[in-house]
């Protein structure tokens, strides 16, 4: 499995949060595609 994206934390900027959510969505897609 690819490594899970690191959460930027509570004090993250909107840009960091956006980047994290995009990476997380990509990660979930990879994981679920491998599983099924």
UniProtKB/Swiss-Prot annotation:
Keyword Nucleus found: no
Chief localization: secreted
PROSITE patterns named among the record's database cross-references: PANCREATIC_HORMONE_1, PANCREATIC_HORMONE_2
Gene3D superfamilies: 6.10.250.900
CDD domains (UniProt xref): PAH
Entries under InterPro entries matching the protein: Pancreatic_hormone-like (IPR001955), Pancreatic_hormone-like_CS (IPR020392)
Modified residue annotations for Tyrosine amide: 36
CC per GO annotation: extracellular space
One GO biological process term: feeding behavior
Membrane-spanning parts: none
Subcellular locations according to the entry: Secreted
Keywords: Amidation, Antibiotic, Antimicrobial, Fungicide, Hormone, Secreted
A molecular function (GO) term: neuropeptide hormone activity
Tissues where this protein is expressed: Skin.
SMART domains: PAH
Source taxon at top rank: Eukaryota
PANTHER family linked to this entry: NEUROPEPTIDE Y/PANCREATIC HORMONE/PEPTIDE YY (PTHR10533), PEPTIDE YY-RELATED (PTHR10533:SF14)
Function: Shows a broad spectrum of antibacterial activity against Gram-positive and Gram-negative bacteria, yeast and fungi.
The family this protein is said to belong to: Belongs to the NPY family.
Protein name: Skin peptide tyrosine-tyrosine
């Amino acid at each position: 499995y690819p490594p899970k994206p690191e959460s930027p934390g509570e004090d993250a900027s909107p840009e960091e949060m956006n980047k994290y959510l995009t990476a997380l969505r990509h990660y979930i897609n990879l994981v679920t595609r491998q599983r099924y």
